[in-house]
Amino acid sequence: MRYLIFVCLWLTQYALPAQIDPANIEIARDQWGVPHIFAPTDAEVAYGLAWATAEDDFLTMQKQLLPAKGLMGQVFGRQGAQLDVIVHLLGARKTTRERYTTDLSPDFRKILEAYADGLNAYAARHPKEVLHRRLFPVDGQDLIPSYMLGLALLSQIDEPLGAIFSGRMGQEVDQERGSNAAAIAPHKTTTGETFLLANSHQPLEGLYSWYKAHVCSEEGWNMLGANFPGGVSLFLGTNPYLGWAHTVNYPDFTDIYKLEMHPERDLTYRFNGKWLKLEPDFYKARIRLLGLLPVGKKQKFYQSKYGITFETPNGFFALRTVANQTIKAPEQWYRMNKARNWDEFRAALDLQGITCTNIVYADREGHIYHLGNGLLPKRDPNYDWSGILPGDTSATLWENDFYPVDQLVQVFDPPSGYVYNCNHTPFRSTGPGDNPDTTAVPPHMGYQRPNDLTNRGARFQALIQQYEQVSYEDFKRIKYDQAYEQPMVAVPWFEPIFHLNPADYPEIQEQILLLRDWDRVADANSEAAATAILAYFHLESALQSGQSVLELDTLPKIRLVEALRSVQDHFVEHFGQPVVRLG
């Protein structure tokens, strides 16, 4: 039975902002506890969203905010300090201060300030829940760095940072996310409706976990969906007119440069034939150790023409990323929330504040769309941007010149009637005859190669092609499909493990027969599924120190055999038997 819990916000006078009247805000919770926030104005709704989110997950909201003030390490130790350092390396606070009033519209700044006011009010009312005495009050500017940090992490900035300090640069990033998104046009559905799938995989709790809400104002903001706790609007979902989903993608968002240092002058590097001095950009974290970075003392970072620069045993390296080139992500999501049709949604995309993640869109007019989204710089085609770049020339220094949305990889209203993405290449985002032209895209944009697939992407394509038209029940069956495609086109090097000759390896004959006869369905009761999945993880882990699984087409048979031996040993050690069920 559905029920509603109505919450009135009675706050202490010192916590109340003058422009927000909490009496105008109503938070109604449904039977699942999801807040439905109603108020006359968008600003009041933002205030209510902050309050409702704090009621449910004030801890995670503070985890999002602490790095913006450099306080995460003081509360959560070494792991927390990593985020403090990344925020510093991004220059997130400085960029926000410089651009807050110029890059964000006045009406959206009111939304940010109202959300901050709601947070401050909750913190004032619940002081025992506050994690650090210097965290509150917050203002609108304090909300922006968490967006920049989140987008940087979604852009896998931790990979190049780790590569710089470990000396393992140039290795391809493995794609471990598990998100799925799809849209089906009315002419492809049995009911003549538009279908949208938003299945973005994030942690169940903690940083960057989904928080579901419904916001509704009398100014046209009416959105049901989800964000990360601390988001001032919703990041995906639906409104009465349209909806969209996100999946993580892997274009070239970050570049690494090796500087040519002067042989005699300290901290002096060559740039365009001149010798320039590195500018100190030191940072002091509050704990003793931070992974590969020593902390607890002043950290010696520098600024060069390329941005943040590091001294390592292998030389000086600079890192340049798109994640800190804009502060417009929160406003773009807000404008997407309020869009009433394709034209308004498309105009919101032109803000280009969301620097990564694919977008899959559908609306009630029948339009569907897939965008290989990203803030991608116009790079000099004479350089190999997949590796380490020379840090001595303006030819490799991309500035504020990015490809506009209409030059990104995309598909709009394809005749095949569907678009989809499962973290795989955007060049396979619809029916075979409607996919984007790979030759029209410069290689230095760094999009995944046309053959970079995931099993989920391969399965969706194989399943959707079976239907002339798709019912809603068909759509759900496709979404909940648990099978692996045969052959495994996403990881072709793994397919031979299913075709080993059991007579050649009697000690693992049982495992080989299981895999040979497996229907490729990852059912909870399947022993073959457990064997295959653990063997894959064993091989993937063994390759991490050297070659990426993305670079493989084949693997020596002995490696596959060793993986099955390892699986058998693991099961015997931990379960007392050579095979076990998946679930």
PLM regions: where:
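Hydrophobic alpha-helical segments
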Residues: 354-467, 522, 535, 539-541
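Glycine- and hydrophobic-rich flexible loops that cap the catalytic core of alpha/beta enzyme folds
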Residues: 217-218, 225-227, 237-242, 246-388
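Substrate-recognition/specificity elements adjacent to catalytic centers across diverse enzyme folds
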Residues: 20-207, 215-233, 322
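Acidic, low-complexity N-terminal propeptides/linkers enriched in Ser/Thr/Asp/Gly that mediate export
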Residues: 108-197, 202-204, 364-368, 376-378, ...
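Gly/Pro-rich active-site capping loops and adjacent beta-alpha segments
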Residues: 44-83, 88-93, 243-294, 400-453
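Proteins synthesized as precursors that undergo proteolytic processing into mature forms
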Residues: 331-357, 364, 437-496
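Bacterial Sec-dependent N-terminal signal peptides
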Residues: 1-19
